[in-house]
Amino acid sequence: MAGSGTAHLRPADDVLLRVENLVVDFPAGRGRKVSAVSNISFDIAPGETLGLVGESGCGKSTTGKAIMQLPRPTRGEVVLEGTNLAGLSGESLRRTRPRLQMIFQDPISSLNPRRTVADIVEEPLKIWGIGTPEERRKKVEEVLTAVGIDPVAASERRPHEFSGGQCQRNSIARAVITDPEVIICDEPVSALDVSVQAQILNLLEDMKERYGLTLVFVAHDLAVVKNVSDRVAVMYLGKMCEIGAPDDLYARPTHPYTAALLSAIPIPDPEVDVDAEHHVGGELPSPINPPSGCRFRTRCPRAEELCAQVEPQMQPVADGGSHFVACHFPLQPVEPGETAVGAPAAE
């Protein structure tokens, strides 16, 4: 069940990026607020890809943008190599921008339609005063070639003259041009055809190895996330439910919501029965007035009175290694001696 806690965090010296107790609220008028992200924590080691999954409205894209400080978190820490980005402002924050970049969902609208692609890719270098004009030109040619775009065509054509897949390649080139450490990939293939998706995913893996990147991969396609991620975190209504290595999490889903997501993946075989055991009905509750205790309890077939009273905390799954879950009544055993019980739910 959706909860909080930091038991799953690794030692600070082992990670590049650490997000702890992150909260992102938006005003909703009449003194109300939308709780988009509510007290979640996770970390990412250098060279790792963390997949963030969940249904629409769970807060995964907002989490990615909050890492970028766009928007600024309401509370919590985003620590990049010992520096809390949430505590920076002005020029100090601005100077961290080259270290974190983003690839957006819509590859065409994320590029300036009035400029050539080569100019768009070069712009970050100009902003930061990196290199001479000739050095910048060579860098742009190098990166465009690496993503599979002809530099000559890029210098002559604007975004609308490229296909969607080519525009996403251009977006990737723009993201890596400043040699960032972390790239937030916000559903980078969801707007593309299936055949093109595979090409872009392979390109991201290639660029990750070539430039030593660390990725946060936001997506709703569980099959895609499994293939590209080193760890997967499942979110529901602004909370984190479960986190672990993809092979472990997909083979032994321990949170009822994770099991429901996996059971919803269509199997192209008419002889295979639909998994009704983990079916979840109903609608996502309002983030303006989320349920007390566990936020998933209103749709969970295993929910009991405790779930309404106490928010569950992250706890290790038995024999799960780096597999953690926040649930009072998990589908798999948890480590003996641990407890999922957290603070009482707010009235």
Which residue stretches match the model-derived regions?
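Short catalytic/signature loops enriched in Gly
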Residues: 2-15, 29, 33, 243-347
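ABC transporter nucleotide-binding domains
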Residues: 1-251, 263, 331-347
